[in-house]
A protein has these predicted regions:
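Periplasmic c-type cytochrome electron-transfer domains
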Residues: 1-209
């Protein structure tokens, strides 16, 4: 008859936060205008497609970043905000690599420029840790209309489910680290360099944690 005769729902060991939120990552019919794109189109399996996209909006205006963090330090001196003023966010930001969704629970202002610290869900001044990763991710609700072309705003309850799901995505373990967590001499030197910043924390007067 080419028809479904019966539908049985099987039990799942997955937590509701996973079941409810995963749909928002993959369901293009719910998240976009015509069902051709979802968040997972670029954030493949919650990670990255390794592509740089130019998603600037020429019709938008320059906005201000509430954080006092010196984002030019993260770029090793280049101006990631366009005007040279690290407190301004120019709408034409140029091509930027898709960032991973893994391990976001320990982040605050999201995006390469930290611009998601500001949005319809509120503002995180991000002056010092702990930063509000949940608020910053909730501000991505605008992307469903601006990037995916959704005809109307995503319901706040859906965005909350997506936020809870995404912040639960963990980064995978280091595949080359020893099982006993011991470090080779080269790895130990790299760890000391990374945690000590080797003087880089004084370049712009902003501490690096």
């Amino acid at each position: 008859s080419r028809r479904e005769r019966q539908h049985l729902r099987l039990s799942s060991p997955e937590a509701p936060v996973i079941v409810d939120g995963r749909r928002l990552l993959y369901d293009a019919t719910h998240s976009s205008s015509n069902g051709e794109a979802s968040c997972a189109s670029c954030h493949v399996f919650g990670h990255t497609d390794q592509l740089a996209w130019d998603l600037g909006n020429p019709d938008a205006g320059v906005t201000r970043l509430p954080s006092s963090i010196k984002f030019n330090l993260a770029a090793l001196g280049s101006n990631v905000n366009g005007t040279g003023n690290v407190g301004e966010l120019h709408p034409l930001k140029g091509p930027m690599l898709t960032q991973t969704l893994r391990g976001l629970a320990y982040h605050g202002p999201m995006h390469w420029r930290g611009d998601r610290a500001v949005g319809v869900s509120g503002t995180d001044p991000a002056t010092e840790p702990p930063f509000d990763a949940s608020l910053s991710f909730m501000n991505f609700i605008a992307a469903f209309e601006e990037l995916l072309g959704r005809a109307e705003p995503l319901p706040t309850a859906d965005m909350r489910a997506f936020t809870d799901f995404s912040l639960a995505i963990a980064a995978p373990p280091n595949p080359i680290r020893a099982l006993d967590n011991s470090l080779t001499p080269a790895q130990a030197r790299g760890r000391r360099f990374f945690l000590g910043c080797d003087g880089l924390d004084t370049r712009s007067g902003a501490p690096v944690d």
